Regions:
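Acidic, histidine-bearing metal-coordination/catalytic regions of metal-dependent phosphoesterases
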Residues: 1-87
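Membrane-embedded segments
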Residues: 65-68, 79-167, 172-175
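Short loop/edge segments at beta-strand edges and connector loops
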Residues: 178-180
Length: 182
């Protein structure tokens, strides 16, 4: 399916920020070419992204609680050239304190920071108790990206703690996408 219109409607950043980001990405690509430990740089027209997933099944990982990091290269004719090299990190369904434990949170934050993403997207279902929201959001706020952090609510978030999550996300400068596009 053609998702170009959806993507451009969902995330339309300030083009001046995007130009600066594009310059930074070109510098990163040059460094990648020089480094023998990296794969070849991403080809033109490809926007790399990062998907970080978690489940309660134990799988060997550098970071406790993180089962896998999946990287995708995305190309589409409607994605502007300015997004060449743009990196998106996505997390979802942490269910903090139920599936995802406190001891795993520091590892997740370090992993997200190591991805050097341009934007962090959060897909909801953050918690399993309102008392855990401040701790979780404060930890995720340590992940700084040039284009910011954007989050939506999951079904569990609407059932409880909805206002707590919104308040904490806004407190740390995160953008809550609720029935709107930015």
């Amino acid at each position: 399916p053609d998702t170009g219109g959806f993507i451009s409607g969902l995330f339309a950043p300030d083009h001046s920020q995007l130009k600066e980001l594009q310059r930074t990405q070109k510098q990163k690509k040059k460094q990648q070419v020089k480094s023998a430990s990296h794969n070849s740089p991403v080809p033109a027209g490809v926007a790399p992204g990062t998907l970080i997933t978690h489940s309660n099944i134990s799988v060997s990982s550098v970071y406790k609680g993180i089962d896998r990091v999946v990287k995708y290269d995305f190309t589409h004719r409607d994605v502007p050239e300015a997004f060449d090299g743009f990196r998106i990190a996505f997390i979802s369904d942490l269910h903090y304190k139920s599936l995802f434990k406190e001891k795993d949170l520091d590892g997740l934050v370090r992993l997200l920071i190591a991805q050097q993403a341009d934007v962090l997207l959060m897909g909801g279902d953050y918690q399993e108790g309102c008392e855990y929201v401040p701790e979780l959001v404060a930890a995720l706020a340590k992940v700084k990206t040039p284009m910011g952090t954007y989050g939506v609510m999951g079904n569990n978030d609407y059932e409880r703690c909805h206002e707590d999550i919104i308040r904490e996300m806004k407190r740390y400068g995160m953008h809550v996408l609720e029935h709107k596009v930015c």
